[in-house]
Each structure stands twice: as structure tokens, then as C-alpha cells.
Curated annotation (Swiss-Prot):
It comes from the Bacteria. This is Peptidyl-lysine N-acetyltransferase Pat. It catalyses: L-lysyl-[protein] + acetyl-CoA = N(6)-acetyl-L-lysyl-[protein] + CoA + H(+). One of its GO terms (molecular function) is protein-lysine-acetyltransferase activity. Acetylates and inactivates the acetyl-CoA synthase (Acs). Can also acetylate other central metabolic enzymes in response to environmental changes. Its EC number is 2.3.1.-. Keywords: Acyltransferase, ATP-binding, Nucleotide-binding, Transferase. Residues 487-523 form the ATP-grasp domain.
Amino acid sequence: MSQQGLEALLRPKSIAVIGASMKPHRAGYLMMRNLLAGGFNGPVLPVTPAWKAVLGVMAWPDIASLPFTPDLAILCTNASRNLALLDALGAKGCKTCIILSAPTSQHEELLACARHYKMRLLGPNSLGLLAPWQGLNASFSPVPIKQGKLAFISQSAAVSNTILDWAQQREMGFSYFIALGDSLDIDVDELLDYLARDSKTSAILLYLEQLSDARRFVSAARSASRNKPILVIKSGRSPAAQRLLNTSAGMDPAWDAAIQRAGLLRVQDTHELFSAVETLSHMRPLRGDRLMIISNGAAPAALALDELWSRNGKLATLSEETCLQLRQALPAHIDIANPLDLCDDASSEHYVKTLDILLASQDFDALMVIHSPSAAAPGTESAHALIETIKRHPRGKFVTLLTNWCGEFSSQEARRLFSEAGLPTYRTPEGTITAFMHMVEYRRNQKQLRETPALPSNLTSNTAEAHNLLQRAIAEGAASLDTHEVQPILHAYGLHTLPTWIASDSAEAVHIAEQIGYPVALKLRSPDIPHKSEVQGVMLYLRTASEVQQAANAIFDRVKMAWPQARIHGLLVQSMANRAGAQELRVVVEHDPVFGPLIMLGEGGVEWRPEEQAVVALPPLNMNLARYLVIQGIKQRKIRARSALRPLDIVGLSQLLVQVSNLIVDCPEIQRLDIHPLLASASEFTALDVTLDIAPFDGDNESRLAVRPYPHQLEEWVEMKNGDRCLFRPILPEDEPQLRQFIAQVTKEDLYYRYFSEINEFTHEDLANMTQIDYDREMAFVAVRRMDNAEEILGVTRAISDPDNVDAEFAVLVRSDLKGLGLGRRLMEKLIAYTRDHGLKRLNGITMPNNRGMVALARKLGFQVDIQLEEGIVGLTLNLAKCDES
């Protein structure tokens, strides 16, 4: 998340080209040519002993002779000289360097050298970067690009060149175009942090092949996507493609889960990528998912409709008033419906009349206009008419409009006109629908991330007991636990299993069956045979002692014949579960090499191929995220919405997934968990067969997760001056209703001191941003008092750190009727201790001069107080290092 050096890379004031050349096709020549042609208005310093000047610019023989230190250096020499040149640049004080080429064998030394001098590196093997707003073309690309508001970050030079060529033909602009190369130092997460605050960037497109730090990526992407749409294309979905790219990219469903969790949108191929670029370049915010389609032919509209249905899209329904107006304005033979087919003899006037009526209505959220080549309404003429209608209509600048002028030659000019007018345009009906559904899915992802999670009922967790059981099993040398052994661990987290007993032989199996009652099931116990079905190691519905004895002996005999070396640890004996009307599910937790633990949900009783048969989520899960996973599974037909007799209990299954998530987050010893089958019967969920793989773990528990979980260890009970006890804890997404109630009990004056303006009401989005925080980037502590099985918030303090984790902005607010109890001071002390322990250097805040209570508290806590009467503010700064010393 560090931003150190990025300003010098992306907005350099001076550039040195190391290895500049006058020989065409040399890297140093191409880089100099592009820098000078791009219009960069700072000094460009060619460095080469071979030439006195390069392209008319005075050259310098070596780095030491440069008249001043450049912000950015670009290495265009033979890779064998990289280390020596980087050392010389570091000694000169250069802040950033682009390395165009370097073998893998140099990577460690290059990175060590850069860190020694606190220099940032882009690359190696980077195409470079383009920043049109700075007139900067520090790349090999000969293609000039226009200024725009779309930023593109790519891990592939080939894809970068393709996009550049495509964008030039369409005169599409960019704010930044950055080719990362091998991402030895500067990586995608840091660039996302930078671009999220860049005023010239309104949308971001990523091409990714791999990640070096999934946690940092998810954190940065989630933060950036709250304000700007981000689309991702990820290659290497198959193992074969991963081998070709020489990456260890992990499971593809894990990427889907991470992208959704961060609020991004994934596109699947280059065709969708180009549509996405068009959409992001001209997109207006989407209000909903209702689409209205206008066409001058039934067939193109039908193609669009088929694609919309295949993607679970939604058509708008026209009101009676709108239908009446359309009937009066259009010829009688036109059927008023959606899609609205104006027929192949439709003139430009028909399009204009239709648009005027629809734009005045509130019946749709997006409008798709299709035009097929027609003598009655030439493409260019119709495009002009549409553009003028949009410009003059009062709602024109607010409507989400997508245009599809079919054909190639006859529609080129029309598409150019749409691009100039800032209207997205596509070549095919299907491509237009794809672009629309991108917008819908992005909006859904963002909305889903901001939903307030429900508080799950009756969740239990006994972390200490689970840890003790796992540590005892590991100490005894166990690597895998079966259903009987894992029962107490699951019970510690409120997960129900079918009662299970162990029998060492057939006689003991009969004895247990007599005790628990028939019918029963027998299951083989062997650490050497993971799949019992391979030896028919599971026998069901055994109704008599004779059947149990025969089945037990048969299992033992089959193992001796098929697996003579296998260790046999007896049999599991279970009562037969009541499967009438029940649904069999499967819940698996696996460790992904990139994203860590994954929670997978699918149907039971099938061969397990997660890429095809499961939906995947990253822990930790709350009720919202778990419910979204279940609904996603139903929509994608990975699980059924009902059994033969009853519907699936979505809330109950969501709660079970939250319990599994809590278990995985709390217990890093768990390497893999397989609950199969999980029997869903009405509101009851019972694990019939469970396998748990375990291993010692002595690292940082949280570091293995792609999303930082709720930090339980920061909870603390505090006694106020009046003797009441309250809990100081990190804020939770579920706190939104209590936070709204808390704010209602704060006076307008106190709110004005806190927010520097009069606020009548906080929206759901405001409160979601306050409660659904990324604990890696900010912290908010709430003081809560528990009364009658409910919690009320008494005070809140918050700190938001910068990406470099140096400074943090703080704020504190206490309920107005509870002042004088020391609550504000205790909350601030809690926040100061946290930020200091988190490695931050300074804590900064502002208040008003007449907020005397806050100013006095700040002085008592050691803050430097800077009263700026002319500005009407008081600056508060605490040096955390000095605070630590004191």
C-alpha cells in the first residue's frame, strides 16, 4: 500500500534515459523519440558516452555527470549493466526507475539495491508507462494516446500493445497506461491506491496474470472500487494456461471470489474486455437494472433479448401513459412493447419521437438503441438525430444510453460520432447487452457490499476448546481426523453432526447397533484409504444384528484384498439419518496458494470438481456474504433451491456457513475440511461424514487470510466514572442500526463540531462506509453498553491511515448526554495505543476553536495544538514515537 516514489514515477518533473541512442530500433532511441514526441514539458536527460547529443538533446556521458538528480530514470541498456547503473542512480538520489529488461537471476539483487537507496522500481520487463495528461510517453509504444479518464494497468506487454492499438483507432483516451512487467517492486495494489485519489481517473481496467500479495490487492481494490468502477480480466484460468504463463495463479474460482469480495467486476475474454473499455470510458451511473430496447428490426432485437435472458437480465415495463404516447406518435402498424421494433422503414424522425417520449418517462434505467443499415434512415443521419436529441433533452445528460449501429463500413462514421459525443457504442447486439450486464453486475456487487448484515441468532463458538482439541491431536501425531474425532471440534462452533461411535470389530459394531437402535450405517476407518467408496467401505440401512455383522466382515475382507498394506482403525457406526425429503450438500474448505482458505459450497453425492460444481467465497463471512454465496449457488445451479418435499432454508444454511467461517478463521491448524454429505432437512443441518486435515501452525493467524478478520483481541471491558461497565471493541458491519440510533442521541452542535457542517440525516451508504471498514486500513472503536440482550453505542473513535502507514486522521464522538464520564478520553487512549502499536508515526485531526472540550482533551493527551483563527480550525497532531517514549 506504500505510495513512496509513485508521484515521481507517475508525475515526474525530470527524466533520465540511461543508454540513449541515435541508432533506430535501439531501446534508447525509441524511448527518447517517444518522450520528445509526447510533449513532456520537463527536462529529458539522455545518458550515453557514445553521443554528444541524442535527437537534438545534449547527452551526458554517465550518471555521475548529470547536472541534477532526475525524478525518474529509464534503463535502456544491456541487462548485464542493470545492477551497476541502479547503484549509480541510487547514489545520485534518483527516486524511481523503469527497468525495461532483466533476467530473473537479477531480481533479488535489484530489489535489495533499490531498497537500500529507498528507490522504487517499475518492472523489470516493463513496456513502460504513458500519462497523457502529463504529456508523458515513457514506453516503447509508438502509438500516441489521447487524454481520457480511464486508467489501464497490465501485467502483459502484448496485451498492452493490443489495447493501445485498439484505442488509437477509436480515438479513446486514458489517464494512465501502466505496464507492470514482473512487478518486482511496484505492484498493482499501490497503483490502485494512487489512482483511487487521482482526479483525472474515473474508472480503472486491470489485466492480471498473478498476484504477489492477495491481502494487499483485495484491500486496495475494495477501497478504490467504492468510488470508481474497476474491471478485471484475468488470464490463466486453466492449469495449462498457468504453465504457459509460468505462474502459480491458484484456483480460478478463488479469483472470482476475491474479485466479487472487493467489489470489482470480472470480464472473461478480450471481446468482453474491449466492450468493457468502451463502457468504462463513457459510462454514466446506473440507477437500476431495467433495460429498454429500441430497434429498426426484429432480428437484432431478438439477438439482444436472447443474450439478456442468458445473463439473467431484466426488461423494463412501459407504463400505460408511455404506451399511449407512443401509439399516438408512431405509425399504427408498430406494436408498442419492449423491445420496441420500429420496423425497417423507420426514419430518423421515428427514433427522435420515441426518444423524446421515453426520456420523459421513469420506466427504465438504461436505454439500448439498435440501428441496422437502412435506406429509410441512413446510419450517420440517425446517429446525428439521436445525439442532438440527447443533447437538447433535459434528462439527456442523466440517462444511461448504449448504442448499437450494426454493420461495419456503413456504420463507421456513426460510431465515430457517438465516441466524440461521449456515448458508448458497440458493434453487435450481444456485445451491447454484455456491456449493460457488466454495469448491472458492478452495481449489484457494490450494493451487496454495502448491505447491512443481519445479526445471526444463537451462534456459539468455544475457540479455546477447539484449539485444545486440535493441539492435542497434533501432539499425538494425527494429520487427519474423521467424523468421530472431529465431532467435539464442530460442536464447539455449534455445528451438528450425526452421533458416531467407533467399533474395533464386527462384534463391537453389533453391540453398538443394539444400543443405538436400527437401522445403522457402517463406515471404514483407515488413514490410507481417503475414498471409502473405492472398497465399498460404506454400508447403509443395516436393520439387524446379522446384517451388521456380515457388512462389517465384508468391509474388512474387501480392504485386505484390495489394500493389503492399509491400516484399519475399525469402523464408524452411526444411526441412519432420516433422509426423507432431505437435500444432500457439500461444504469444503481448501487452502489456495494465492488467496489462502476458501469456503466452497455444492451439491452432495457427486464427483467433486470445484471449478464446475461449487461456488466459492473467502472467509471471514457474515450473514450477508454467506447468504449471497447460497443465492449465487442457486442461480448458477450449483445447488438446488429445494428438495423433493421442501425448499432449502437459505437463512439456516447461511448461518452454518458463518459458523464454518468462524472455525476456519479462529483455527489456523485446519488445512482442509470436507463435510460430505451435509444433510439439509427443513431448518436442520447435520454433518453425516466429515474429514479434517490438520498441521502445526506457528505463524501469524491473520496473515494467511486474504481479508483481515474481526480483531477479537482488541476487545476490552472498561469502567466509566459512574461505575457502569462498557465494552470497547472494533466496529462491525452489523452495528449500522445501533450507530444510527447513537447519532440520533448526539446534539446538532456536537455533530457540527465533528463533521464541520449541519447534517440532517445520514444515508445508508454513509453509515455503511462507517461500519463496513477494512481493518487493514482504518480502525473504529465503539463503546457499547449491553442492556436487555441488546447493545447501545455510547461513543465512537476512528483513525484512517494513509497508504504508507505513516499518518492517520482521527475523530472521536461521544453521546451528548454522557459527557463528563471520561468516555472520550478512554476511547482516545485506546485509539492512540492501537495506532502506535500498528506502526503509525503521527495522529492528526482538526476541530473548531470553540470546541473547548476537545482542545483541552487533546492537550492532556500530549497533542500539539495549532489554533488557526483565520481559518476557523484547530490542528491537532500527536507524535506517536514521542508518545511511546513517554
